[in-house]
Amino acid sequence: MIKSLLLLISIIIGIVISQEGAYPPAGIYVGLSSNFLTTEGESLTTYAQNELLSMSLPDQSGSSSKASYTFTSFKLGLTLDNIFYNQLQTDVYQIGWETISFELQWNYHICANAIFNPCENGNIQVGTVSGASAAVASNVYVEFNSTSTSIIATNTTMAFDQGAVQVNVHCSNAICVIPVSDIANEVAQNFVTELTNGITKAINEQVPTIEALFTPIKQIPMTLSNGDSFWINLEGTLVEESNPTADLPTITAALNGGVILENTDGNFVYPSQIPSYIPTDSQLESFTSDYSIVVTGFFIESLFDAVFASALPMTINPSQVPSASPVQLNTSDGFFSGVAPGLSQYPNLGIQVNCYSPVTPLVSINSSAISLFNLELSADFIILNGDNPFTAFTVLFTIDASLSTEILTDSPSTFSLNSTLASMTPNATIVTSTIGSVDATGFVQLMQMVQGVIKLPSPAYSVPSKYSMSNVELQLGTQVIQITFDLIDSSLLEKQKIIKKSINFN
């Protein structure tokens, strides 16, 4: 049985099909453990119960052709048990409780519109019968697009077995002849309407917290100097764990996870790749913490793809090279005159470099490193010969590299991935030349020189403000990077602090 807190995942999915143990290829898998779902389900149940028990139940009075009445001192007892979640159809879900038990009591004073106007007093009880079946559920509509997510709970209904709800009237007078049941039934029906409306309201009030759990990963917190930004494609599928044993089994959102480039002009560029790797069930389900993020190579490949699409083609002019750089873009520079002797025919002229046509690397992950293979980048070296610039030669760079990654806890609610270039194996091929021979090994040495100054971005991830993190861990496995941590409700921590202060006698 899929239960209510799966809604936490469904808010970020445009195409959702709940299935058991059949994971599709994806770039990101976000898992919520059975223990976490159970805890959150209990919190939602408590919140809904408290909201219903705090409903205003004012005194009522009215009259009909047969009698006038006054109802006072309403009291309500209510319990919700066994929270559940179902998918009804695409983008329409159901959240509710398998069992609802309640008892509503109030006092009555009623007078018949007859000779002598006889009046009676007593109390009325409306409630569920022990052992009978009564349930309540709300329809929840989820809408996701590239800019916003909307979750709305509507149409809460209660379902009863016949005889599950009874109305009992207790008259305290010696003689009781005035019929009260019809009016009591009407009040009971109105109460059920208020009750279902209250459940709808309680769920909708929790929507911001539910949405916030996944909102931080919609956009990669990284912006290039040109203002371009990067989003994650969150279309995906909900998957139950392969062999569920708990009432609330571990659930994973298998998300496309491709990185989408948003240009400053508002256009979107989607990845040229598609996900192909499927982690094993064990890789996705064996975590013991509350929360798991599993990343496959497709996410990294599409990130390179998006960065290249944003940054390239790129032109580097001589004026952009710092004066302290050991290599200057000039035909008379020691490096260029050494690798391309033919440049001596064009002394002291600037060189412009046009970089283009990248080939995104293939990514492989094992327990010790993230490896990049066959990254290709072409560069034209253009001599700025007055009004007649021309391409002196073109170099094709092919690079294999290895990345090391560590996780840093920046605050109780934020962590970042710090990746560094552990090793790099560059190769260079001279594709064309108009100035004679060019020594490709010189460009290999140049790439080796810049290895130490290459800086990789360290994107940060923040959990919703309701939570703080503990036990944050990073693990590399076969073709996956897995981050796991526990989520602690910050409000519970504050309550614990208050309790500790209250018993401190020093």
Swiss-Prot record:
Family to which the UniProt record says this protein belongs: Belongs to the UPF0522 family.
GO annotations of cellular component type: extracellular region
Signal peptide positions (record): 1-18
PANTHER family, A to Z: BACTERICIDAL PERMEABILITY-INCREASING BPI PROTEIN-RELATED, UPF0522 PROTEIN A-RELATED
Localisation per UniProt entry: Secreted
Keywords: Glycoprotein, Secreted, Signal
Name this polypeptide is given: UPF0522 protein A
Glycosylation sites per record: N145, N155, N330, N366, N418, N427
Keyword Kinase: no
GO MF term list: lipid binding
SUPFAM superfamilies linked: Bactericidal permeability-increasing protein, BPI
